[in-house]
Amino acid sequence: MLWLRRLFARNRPRNAHAVEVWQWNRIESLWADLCYAVRILSKSPGFTAVAVASLALAIGANTTIFSYANQVLFVRLGVPHPEQLRVFRLTGDDHIAVREIKGHDVYVSDDGHFRLGLFPYPAYQQLRHNNRVVEDIFAFMQPPDVDITAAGMSEVGKVEFVSGNFYTQMQVKPQLGRPIEAADDGTPGGGAVAVISDSFWHRDFGGTQDVIGKTIRVNLTPVTIIGVNPPNFSGPVAADTSAPEIFLPLSMLTTVFPDPTGILMAPNTLLLQLMARSKPSVSTAAAQASLDTSFNAAFRGTAIVNKGETVPRLSLEDGSRGITSGTRDLLQPLYIVLGLAGLVLLLACANIANLMLARASLRQREMSIRMALGAGKVRILRQVLTESLLLSAMGGAAGLVLGYTSRNLIPWLMRTAWDGGEMNVGFDWRVFGFTCAVTLITGIVFGIAPAWRSSRAEINTALKEGSQTSSKRRKAWSGKMIVGFQAALSTLLVISAIFFLRTLLNLNSVDPGFRTQHLLLLDVTPSPTLLDTASQVARLRSRVADAFATIPGVQEVTYANHSLGDANSDWRSPFQREGALQDLAADPKKTGHAYAMFSYVGPHFFSTMSIPILAGRGFNAQDTETAVPVSVVNQALVRKFFPNTNPIGKRFFGGYGTRLIVGVCADTRYSDMRQPTPPVHFDLDPQSPWPGQMTYIIRSPLRPAALVPSLRRAVQLIDPDLPLSNIRTQQ
């Protein structure tokens, strides 16, 4: 930028007094340029308003999108030295020795391997005991939503179970009270204490200082509040749409979620997420190698590894932003949207540059007179750039306000009209710096062409009569270049919009495999501590379904442990068809066990969802709790596990036990409309021990707003403490 250097370095004086005078004159000159720019722009209010509005919209859109991208991609955990944190992960193939996965931190990488962020509890204990290469390993897990009763009010919320060293290793101190300590996590069921979030403290207790020592109930289990987290601490996930409201000791897990079968603590069940702080003296590669060896020994020493099964490999990842698996699918769309927003900003700059060029041609005589009176080209250049920067500053200020007020727009657009959860997008120094940088660059970009044109005015020619036509001819090349640039950008944006619209139309035309119209979904979470047996859970669910079915306007009712098409539904378990163990013994490399998705569904599921049964039958009245456990499988599962074979009457092991296949249903989308249908088996819920949250699916032509009050009353008549939440439509 040689011209900028000349702008401030020309005729620089050499002695101290002259330097002081020169600096003061320079400030006066800049101030005069600014005042003149204000007067010039105020004389053209229409032009100024159009330019500022265009810049405000473009900069505001970029600020809004960058605010969301900053929250998802760059914001670190609100803990001291987050760069020291490491997240533990597992990598495995179809033959890993895992029986159950309790969580959603699972995906398939590009190389076809499973990437898991979950660990068995017994292996964690061994790994922590043998660790020498990182600071103390801490564990945590977020279970399904729970029923929280506080200050006499019942609600559905999220909790996080944490190990006794969680707060010590996170280096977080509560703003009130004390944290969860090792003594609270020593004995199963013995640490009935809780640390609550700052938002929960203010919402349910009004932010009063006497909250310490008060009792709340989590799934009807009383716990005593011992601390309140700092406002900037949301747990182990930085950009979470639903941060935990209550933190409990890990020892309380089987009390809040009774586990008579011992599945939660089973050595082959993936349950916990792990993190640790790195040691300065040990590299990440060396720590990973040592921990992988230790985990292999710990897993083989605690879990069951059959012939042909493999132990997953352990790896360490950056944990400064906490658990980021939930944002993995957002990366590519975010980068695309950021690029498109940048193109819109460039287009706005080109538009204003064209307007400025048009104004420059009309001001040729003015500039020529100023140059004839002694103004140098640098002074003219600086004056026009000052006007451009003033315009960009006004547009940037308006864009900053627009970006701040609409910073939560993207999360709001991503949630349904009935879903109350939302991400609180921060507005930190990165966003402010980004907006200031964009404003400065914008002013230079759209101002440099008019400034350069104005500084090259020919005095004699411009002062002659008719010089305006001549100047128009001489400026034509720059105007045509900008118009061409605008046309190119506009074409690119139009093509991008066409592709985007085509993608939306394609997604809208994808057949999900069931009828999505007139389906209302809502979640009901019974307390597992109140319902001691699976039969009690089944009876409660039947009562709720029967109550919903009697409401006028309701055509059919069913329920499932999650809704089809839910992006957060990733329920999978090992799948072994009947005879697979014999095949595995004969040739370990031939079969092994693969994974299949599964859903626990209620009676009338297939008729309510309008999913056709292609072979066999659906569920009927003979499929009681004491009858043989049955399942309906989809076509994708038949193609993978029963090729060229009739699956009806065959048995398989998956989910919570052995089941009999009684029917084959059509393929439906499971969790992603863009992905092929995975193998899925639908298990009858009354025959399963699943005690957690259920999604009720109601088919009705009535508007949701008209139906919801009746649904709430029906639930309250059964149990006033039974929470109803997350109301949304299937579409």
Stretches with model-predicted labels:
Residues 7, 11-49, 319-326, 355-382, ...:
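Alpha-helical transmembrane segments of integral membrane proteins
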Residues 77-144, 268-273, 511-577:
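Membrane-proximal extracellular/periplasmic loop immediately following the first transmembrane helix
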Residues 43-58, 62-65, 215-218, 278, ...:
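Conserved beta-strand->loop/alpha-helix structural units within folded catalytic cores of enzymes
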Residues 45-72, 76, 81, 347-349, ...:
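Short, strongly hydrophobic transmembrane alpha-helices
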Residues 95-97, 145, 158-183, 190-332, ...:
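Mid-to-C-terminal secondary-structure elements
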Residues 58-60, 372-376, 395, 399, ...:
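A short glycine-centered flexible hinge/capping loop motif at secondary-structure junctions
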Residues 326-343, 430-434:
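N-terminal membrane-entry
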